[in-house]
């Protein structure tokens, strides 16, 4: 098996750090880069999701032969960015709880930021070889699967993230026909995001979720469009 390079965006969160460990522990992975807003001992770059200039700077550094990692061409790019509670405000349960500031922040973090990551990091995928770009979505981002209501901003932002991925994937697949593009539902995972809503014993360990998501991703075939699946590899309706 040939060696490969992997990039994790949002590598400081529970799921992002588990993805990074997964790649670091794979002997076939010659380079595992984790980017986040937090400084760490093993990364030379950091970005701010809501600052496009910093995203562009990181992407440029990764495709620069004189950069900290040399010229990178990634087989795997995982976007693990996102948040449910933003600025100490949790999801809205009722229509009367909506306010423009909170809605805009949800879209900024869970849709606009991820879209700009696609813009700047899609070009770093391998060109004429099998590759994968996956972004963390959520089952609540499915319009068809919405039977419970609530969580207005988070649902809407994740649905927007899905649409942005689908549209970008169709364009990107014209140059990268062997690439898989996926919106991933990681399940309910032990993390700061889920801690207020579910007991730890009822949630997946991050490493277990990542192991299953990687298994699901390896079984997806290029279709020229994005695919929406859960951690078990089951298709989720858009």
Q: PLM features: what roles do these ranges have?
A:
Residues 78, 134, 181-184, 194:
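Hydrophobic structural elements of the Rossmann-like NAD(P)H-binding subdomain
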Residues 83-87, 91-107, 127-175:
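Catalytic loop of short-chain dehydrogenase/reductase
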Residues 115, 159-170, 207-214:
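Conserved active-site helix of classical SDR/Rossmann-fold NAD(P)-dependent CH-OH oxidoreductases
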Residues 179, 183, 191, 198-238:
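C-terminal helical subdomain
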């Amino acid at each position: 098996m040939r060696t490969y390079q992997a990039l994790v965006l949002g590598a400081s969160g529970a799921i992002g750090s588990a993805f990074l460990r997964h790649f670091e522990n794979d002997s076939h992975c010659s380079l595992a880069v984790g980017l986040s807003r937090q400084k760490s001992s093993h990364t030379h770059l950091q970005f701010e999701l809501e600052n496009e200039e910093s995203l562009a700077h990181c992407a440029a550094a990764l495709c620069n032969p004189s950069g900290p990692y040399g010229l990178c061409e990634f087989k795997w790019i995982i976007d693990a960015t996102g948040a449910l509670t933003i600025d100490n405000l949790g999801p809205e349960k009722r229509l009367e709880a909506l306010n423009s500031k909170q809605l805009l922040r949800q879209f900024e973090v869970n849709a606009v930021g991820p879209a700009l990551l696609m813009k700047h990091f899609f070009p770093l995928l391998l060109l004429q070889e099998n590759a994968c770009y996956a972004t963390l979505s959520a089952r609540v981002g499915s319009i068809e699967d919405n039977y419970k209501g609530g969580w207005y901003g988070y649902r809407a932002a994740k649905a927007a993230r899905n649409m942005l991925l689908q549209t970008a994937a169709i364009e990107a697949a014209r140059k990268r026909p062997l690439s898989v593009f996926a919106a991933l539902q990681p399940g309910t995972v032990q993390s700061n995001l889920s801690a207020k809503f579910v007991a730890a014993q009822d949630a997946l360990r991050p490493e277990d979720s990542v192991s299953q998501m990687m298994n699901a991703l390896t079984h997806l075939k290029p279709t020229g469009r994005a695919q929406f699946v859960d951690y078990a590899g089951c298709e989720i309706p858009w």
